[in-house]
Structures are given as structure tokens and as C-alpha cells.
């Protein structure tokens, strides 16, 4: 039986308004075999232009993986280049992709948005 990698995906809220609307992520959690590709989607709050992806590994603080303002992507971490990427196919959507998952990728991944 192959080794499985568990990636928890949780909701991140940053700059939410009084209506309670927030970002949504899918899937909410993901279990993947080592070596498989994973894609996580984030839908931002309407009107927010900046989207952030964070990662929190067990026993560690959160780290910014990447953020984008409109279509401009900025890398803010020492994440393994080539395996992690984020795309912004629409103004309000970002997709974090992890290629060839490894044991060390097991973490909580969350997104947030701001004006």
C-alpha cells in the first residue's frame, strides 16, 4: 500500500465585511498519495484584488507561500521552486498547484483576500 500524504485545507478570512461573506476554498481537505499532483482553489471576496496563499506545518507558524495583486504573482517564501505554483485564471480566483507531492508537503494550506 502506498504512503499517503494528508493536506488540510482550511478557510482563511482577511478583511471580511459585515455580511459575513468570506473566501471559499475547495476542496476543504485533500488526501493524496506521495508523488501525485494536487490543486487547491480559492474564491476571493468580491471586490478584493489581493489573494494570499499560506502554509502551516505541524508545530510551526504560518508562512506566506505567495500572493498576487490582480494578475501579478509574487513569491514570498522559500518554497520548492518548480513544484509549487499559483495561477490567477480569473480576478477573483487563485489556484495553488503542488506537483509531485512529498511527505514534507503535509500541512494546512489556506487562502485569504484583501482590498
Curated annotation (Swiss-Prot):
Stored Gene3D superfamilies: Immunoglobulins
Start and end residues of each stretch annotated as Disordered: 67-97
DNA-binding keyword on record: no
Subcellular location: Cell membrane
Domain Ig-like, residue spans: 22-115
InterPro entries tied to this protein: Ig-like_dom (IPR007110), Ig-like_dom_sf (IPR036179), Ig-like_fold (IPR013783), Ig_V-set (IPR013106), TCR_beta_variable (IPR050413)
Record key words, sorted: Adaptive immunity, Cell membrane, Disulfide bond, Immunity, Immunoglobulin domain, Membrane, Receptor, Signal, T cell receptor
Cysteine disulfide partners in this protein: 42-111
GO biological process: adaptive immune response; cell surface receptor signaling pathway
One Pfam assignment: V-set
Range of residues in the leader sequence: 1-21
GO cellular component, one term: T cell receptor complex
Keyword flag Protease: no
SUPFAM superfamilies: Immunoglobulin (SSF48726)
Main location: membrane
Quaternary assembly: Alpha-beta TR is a heterodimer composed of an alpha and beta chain; disulfide-linked. The alpha-beta TR is associated with the transmembrane signaling CD3 coreceptor proteins to form the TR-CD3 (TcR or TCR). The assembly of alpha-beta TR heterodimers with CD3 occurs in the endoplasmic reticulum where a single alpha-beta TR heterodimer associates with one CD3D-CD3E heterodimer, one CD3G-CD3E heterodimer and one CD247 homodimer forming a stable octameric structure. CD3D-CD3E and CD3G-CD3E heterodimers preferentially associate with TR alpha and TR beta chains, respectively.
PANTHER family, per the entry: T CELL RECEPTOR BETA VARIABLE 7-4-RELATED (PTHR23268:SF20), T-CELL RECEPTOR BETA CHAIN (PTHR23268)
Free-text function comment from the UniProt entry: V region of the variable domain of T cell receptor (TR) beta chain that participates in the antigen recognition. Alpha-beta T cell receptors are antigen specific receptors which are essential to the immune response and are present on the cell surface of T lymphocytes. Recognize peptide-major histocompatibility (MH) (pMH) complexes that are displayed by antigen presenting cells (APC), a prerequisite for efficient T cell adaptive immunity against pathogens.
Protein's name in the database: T cell receptor beta variable 7-4
Provenance organism: Homo sapiens
Amino acid at each position: 500500500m502506498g504512503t499517503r500524504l494528508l493536506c488540510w485545507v482550511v478557510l482563511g478570512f482577511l478583511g471580511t465585511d459585515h455580511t459575513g461573506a468570506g473566501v471559499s476554498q475547495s476542496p476543504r481537505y485533500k488526501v493524496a498519495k506521495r508523488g501525485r499532483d494536487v490543486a487547491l482553489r480559492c474564491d476571493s471576496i468580491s471586490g478584493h484584488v489581493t489573494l494570499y496563499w499560506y502554509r502551516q506545518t505541524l508545530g510551526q507558524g504560518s508562512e506566506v507561500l505567495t500572493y498576487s495583486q490582480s494578475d501579478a504573482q509574487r513569491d514570498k517564501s522559500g518554497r520548492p521552486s518548480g513544484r509549487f505554483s499559483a495561477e490567477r485564471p480569473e480576478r477573483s480566483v487563485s489556484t495553488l498547484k503542488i506537483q509531485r507531492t512529498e511527505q514534507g508537503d503535509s500541512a494546512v494550506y489556506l487562502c485569504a483576500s484583501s482590498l
